[in-house]
């Protein structure tokens, strides 16, 4: 195995840790981003586990830049025993945290917000470098973390239980929220910072410690975030395991999911893995919060403002190269405006190249709007999906599809519009790539039926100017998703509302709204301040 000497934070980031690994020099592009966060630029091994101490002696994970294929970092992950140790440390830390008054936890959260705020641009660039989303989206993702810290700080003084009237004289009923203990956070590659942020902020403010297993392909984002949080915890006399980190792959994830010392597992990822995770957590009667795949539709009705719809669809279908859980994958067009709207879309899609308005290229270049897919495996899934649609009789409507050469290697593909056959399986599955499937409808009822006729239930949007259609869309006969928008695209939610989806998207809610209520154990407490012992419902039990 690899010889690892740990890297204390105070050491210069470029220090050579292991002669076997410290032989490479990075591109100036990657070095600039990593140095801004004090991450090594010489290929030395980076400890990928933190439970108060940095360490890790599991397998080495390579972080690969999706835009260039360059190895930008090597991370020594946690092994199974170390994961168990970290879980125990997190459990111990939860006892200290739950004793801390909520508003004091709020003050710690405010300081975390400041630490993140000071590095928003640098961290955003790391998201772009490691995940591949464009610069403004990388920064936007960190901003979401900052925003949820603000929200959580406020929540620290307002998380309210309830006082309820009792039917018995001189009795009162309270509903009381208390911390759960340990929240395990398993996150997906496509939001390597924000998803953790939503969970950390709400879990911590409600008095829980956390243990985070990030995606195996975005360990550097996780390490950088944890390094920003670490000094804040230390300054406030809190153990590091209040926000533990275990980089690793499936085995590490399974340790967390299966551990009865992890009171709640907040899992963000695919439906396939989420189903497994949900069953394992259920089997031990733990709590699971599942945020799984989406298959999101936009409906453009005959009375829609087409220019607005166009902007929204392009951002949600092409943005993040189709790699948001909320990306638009299905587009239902009223027959009367369909041809016009498709030609408006194609004007943009067919102009997309490294030279034109919908510019594809280095996500770190401010002018780029289309970045790469995250891995070469994702390119293959994109290609297979397109081949399958065409084999089954569907058509590609865009001039170009397939791999795109922007002159820097990487996993770039052409955003593609397709017209699959009506019964094509692509309508009901999430392909995590910029493929937009189009079909027509004649009535709003039919469009709503099409929107709802898939297993997933994350996000849906209706473009209309008709108030009756709006009412229908939002009501009991309307869209069945967790996010139901009008004249706003399917992606780009704000943190104020609860975020999550229904059906096979997992029914979880994170972030704002009432999401915090899932991170606590609720007790209903009836208190008798009389000198009698009456029973509820007038029951008489003559003693
Ligand atoms: P994924 O399911 O492949 O992996 C998610 C996480 O699970 C990773 O950390 C992975 O290492 C871990 N994992 C894999 N097998 C495991 C197991 N058996 N036990 C425990 N952990 C295991 O997902 P991904 O490819 O990283 O992310 C893309 C998916 O995430 C898409 O389906 C997307 O829609 C979804 N997503 C959903 C939301 C949401 O809020 N609904 C947000 C972001 C992403």
Question: Where do the protein language model's features map onto the residues?
Answer:
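Rossmann-like NAD(P) dinucleotide-binding subdomain of oxidoreductase/dehydrogenase enzymes
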Residues: 161-308, 441
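Structural signal for hydrophobic packing residues in well-ordered secondary-structure cores
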Residues: 94, 98, 113-120, 124, ...
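ALDH superfamily catalytic-core signature
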Residues: 231, 272-422, 486, 535, ...
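Residue-level signal for inorganic ion chemistry
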Residues: 69, 105, 127, 207, ...
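N-terminal Rossmann-like NAD(P)+-binding subdomain of aldehyde/semialdehyde dehydrogenases
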Residues: 3-171, 351
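Short, well-ordered beta-strand elements within core beta-sheets of diverse protein domains
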Residues: 71-78, 93-99, 185, 298-301, ...
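Conserved C-terminal structural/oligomerization subdomain of aldehyde/semialdehyde dehydrogenase
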Residues: 26, 67-73, 237, 299, ...
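Residues at or immediately preceding the N-termini of alpha-helices
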Residues: 66, 80-83, 102, 120, ...
